Amino acid sequence: MVPRCDIILASPTATFGQPEINLGVIPGAGGTQRLTHAIGKSRAMELILTGRNFSAKEAESWGLVSRVVGEGEGEVVKEAVKVAAAIANKGRIAVQAAKEAVDAGELCLGCGHDMDVAC
């Protein structure tokens, strides 16, 4: 789910993973494609094929998490509210256009998502 988010803040104790392989299935909802796009093929293959969990620090170093914040969930929520407020104070049209421009770089992702659905 993380690769679908625009901005990701995490606590230092957060863990992430693609555990579906442990259940005999592949990540759904485009998970294989989104993770590969976000962190690269080799690293995505390792995580998807082993089902290994990874830390917030690893996720941050790979660019999957925007920032590791504070010491706990409460601090992450406070920082998320600050980020949201900063964005809300910008021009709505400019924010929407910027999001669309960034998202346009992922248009080919849909092809991979179709492959996930077919599996």
Task: Give each language-model segment a name.
Residues 1-49, 62, 79, 83:
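CoA-thioester-processing core
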Residues 51-58:
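Acidic, divalent-metal-coordinating active-site segment for phosphoryl/phosphodiester hydrolysis
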